[in-house]
UniProtKB/Swiss-Prot annotation:
Name of this protein: 1-deoxy-D-xylulose-5-phosphate synthase
Key words, A-Z: Isoprene biosynthesis, Magnesium, Metal-binding, Thiamine biosynthesis, Thiamine pyrophosphate, Transferase
Pfam family membership, one: Transket_pyr
EC nos: 2.2.1.7
Species: Burkholderia pseudomallei (strain 668)
Gene Ontology cellular-component annotations: cytosol
Gene3D superfamilies in alphabetical order: 3.40.50.920, 3.40.50.970
Binding of Mg(2+), residues: D146, N176
Length: 634
């Protein structure tokens, strides 16, 4: 099994193969990807769709001297396997294992780290210009998907690239008719009409030379009609940017891919190759449902993904989705917005029930935020469902277009804190720090499912921009209450009180997901625990009261410490004139790698044992002195 694949330890081995061996190699590589992902979990559909393209690129180009930048990067498992990491696939996305995304520190073949969308053309152009300035003669290649082409950054880069006539730059559009959610927008809908009559007539001589090795024009026209729904933008548009447009060609046909790429190597200036692929290619279950198989956990390939038979705790994403539908049913002004993450953000049901108030704006976070601001000016109640890590991409719009005008936009911030297998690129480590410094913002952190629901309701009632952050995955098992209750603005609650005498009284001020482990630590230490709820406005009265009645304060948050929620507590304490020793716990000042979420929290000292250990080491010389019965406040 894998007789050919076992001989490939780097692309130089691949380039020694006869062309007739490449399709059998592709079959082995696809089977290996399926087998590997079924055992570890990971991104599947996208990787099954890039097997032949990956082989062709490494076969034709002299990697790593020629640079390949993979946009988003979750489709790079075939690339990793062919570049010396075949055996490492058993550790994929596990702690101390290989990353699920390109990583410069992992391999010289990973020329640029990616995970967020639409960055590849900018990076590849920088490499191409840098190569030219250094006197090197190498190609820089950006592989970008149809979904990623909806983002403004991709077009900004193409606008810049089009005037770089002597840059050896190739942009490959991997058109697979599927981003994570289906591609949206007018460019998608009208491609066939705009392109079909003009592409060949406008083709330059260089393009015609490349096409001479591809299928005949009539066959291309047939393929164009077949795949029109998945294509993103017309050939004429790319040519207006200054690119030679080539394609579309079948991205699973090595006999088209390889000679086309070989001819492109002889051309100068920016080239644009349009390849049509199919997500899930070669595995019928993934072909039929590429969304289900986008990022599965472990499963049996022979049986496919089976629904769990054990009752699962409700996820925070589900809590949000249910709340949004309930809120929209009660108030016709509620509008839901997602930047291309309908499934991931829990908006599938909302789209079905309220299609006229559902807006998927594509991978366009900047537009999503300003669009929401515009809706708010018309008296609507926009809710932007967005991952914490992707909100970073719209920071100026958040400040300039929403907060500066004090517009009532709700930001439902999913994937706050550590996210596990996706690692540092997707972690929501910074939102508390970068939100609390913005005037007019209200910022809340949910500690359980029902509190999340009620916080979202509270946010919708505010006359200013308001954010509610919540983590990835299942909650604590707390049942949600159907009836809505508005949480008093800027007010936390004491969940447990210490019985320790003066001199040993510790108060833990916990935010969001850190309430539960803080309570566990407090049981071991007999400490007071406050669920702070609000990062902004911070409950200054509660902070100051705890400072007056306790000897030591500890703040705990699942976010960066610098400028975060703990800093808000320290500021409030200092204003009171009562100064106590403070220990601020949170994510370390480094990028936290991928791995099991519970293990990562433990390594960061943010589980119950870790919090207790840090408190003992900082404040308590004799831990046995603080053992006493727990007292919790309901």
């Amino acid at each position: 099994m894998y007789d050919l694949l076992k001989t490939i330890d780097d692309p130089a081995d691949l380039r020694r193969l006869d062309r007739r061996q490449l399709q059998p190699l592709a079959d082995e590589l696809r089977a290996f990807v399926l087998d590997s992902v079924s055992k570890t979990g990971g991104h599947l559909s996208s990787n099954l769709g890039t097997v032949e393209l990956t082989i062709a690129l490494h076969y034709v180009f002299n990697t790593p001297d020629d640079r390949i930048v993979w946009d988003v990067g979750h489709q790079t498992y075939p690339h990793k396997i062919l570049t010396g990491r075949r055996d490492g696939m058993k550790t994929l996305r596990q702690f101390d294992g290989i990353s699920g995304f390109p990583r410069r520190s992992e391999s010289e073949y990973d020329t640029f780290g990616t995970a967020h969308s639409s960055t590849s053309i900018s990076a590849a152009l920088g490499m191409a210009i840098g190569s030219k300035l250094n006197g090197d003669d190498r190609f820089s290649i950006a592989v970008i998907g149809d979904g990623a082409m909806t983002a403004g950054m991709a077009f900004e880069a193409m606008n810049n690239a089009g005037v770089s006539e002597d840059a050896k730059l190739l942009v490959i559009l991997n058109d697979n008719d599927m981003s994570i959610s289906p591609p949206v927008g007018a460019l998608n809908r009208h491609l066939a009409r705009l392109m079909s009559g003009r592409f060949y007539a406008a083709a330059r001589a260089g393009v015609e030379r490349v096409l001479s090795v591809a299928p005949p024009v009539l066959e291309l026209a047939r393929k164009l009609e077949e795949h029109a729904k998945g294509m993103v933008v017309p050939a004429t548009l790319f040519e207006e940017f200054g690119f030679n447009y080539i394609g579309p060609i079948d991205g699973h046909d090595l006999d088209s891919l390889i000679p086309t790429l070989q001819n492109i190597k002889e051309l100068r200036g920016p080239q644009f190759l349009h390849v049509v692929t199919k997500k899930g290619q070669g595995y019928k279950l993934a072909e039929a449902d590429p969304v289900l198989y986008h990022g599965p956990g472990k499963f049996n390939p022979a049986e496919g993904i089976k629904p769990s038979t054990t009752p699962a705790k409700k996820t925070y994403t589900q809590v949000f989705g249910e709340w949004l539908c309930d809120a929209a049913e009660l108030d016709a002004r509620v509008v839901g917005i997602t930047p291309a993450m309908r499934e991931g953000s829990g908006m599938v049901e909302f789209e079905k029930r309220f299609p006229e108030r559902y807006y998927d704006v594509g991978i366009a976070e900047q537009h999503a935020v300003t669009f929401a601001g515009g809706l708010a000016t018309e008296g609507l109640k926009p809710v932007v469902a967005i991952y914490s890590t992707f909100l970073q991409r719209a920071y100026d719009q958040l400040i300039h277009d929403v907060a500066l005008q004090n517009l009532p936009v709700v930001f439902a911030i999913d994937r706050a804190g550590l996210v596990g297998a996706d690692g540092a690129t997707h972690a929501g480590a910074y939102d508390l720090a970068f939100l609390r410094c913005i005037p007019n913002m209200t910022v809340m952190a949910a500690s359980d499912e029902n509190e999340c629901r009620q916080m979202l309701h509270t946010a919708l009632q505010q006359p200013n921009p308001t954010a509610v952050r919540y983590p990835r995955g299942a909650g604590t098992g707390v049942a949600t209450v159907k009836a809505f209750t508005e949480i008093p603005l800027g007010k936390g609650e004491v969940r447990r009180r210490t019985s320790q005498p003066d001199g040993k009284r510790i108060a833990i001020l916990a935010f969001g997901t850190m309430v539960a482990p803080s309570l566990a630590a407090a049981d071991a230490l007999d400490a007071t625990v406050a669920n702070m709820r609000f990062v902004k406005p911070i409950d200054a009265e509660l902070v100051q009261a705890l400072a007056r009645t306790h000897d030591y304060l500890v703040t705990v948050e699942e976010g960066c410490v610098m400028g975060g929620a703990g800093s808000a507590c320290v500021e409030a304490m200092m204003e009171s004139g009562v100064v106590r020793p403070v220990l601020q716990l949170g994510l370390p000042d480094r990028f936290v790698d991928h791995g099991d979420p519970a293990k990562l929290l433990s390594l960061c000292g943010l589980d119950g044992d870790g919090i207790a250990k840090s408190i003992r080491e900082r404040f308590l010389s004799h831990a046995a002195d603080v053992a006493s019965p727990a007292k919790r406040v309901a």
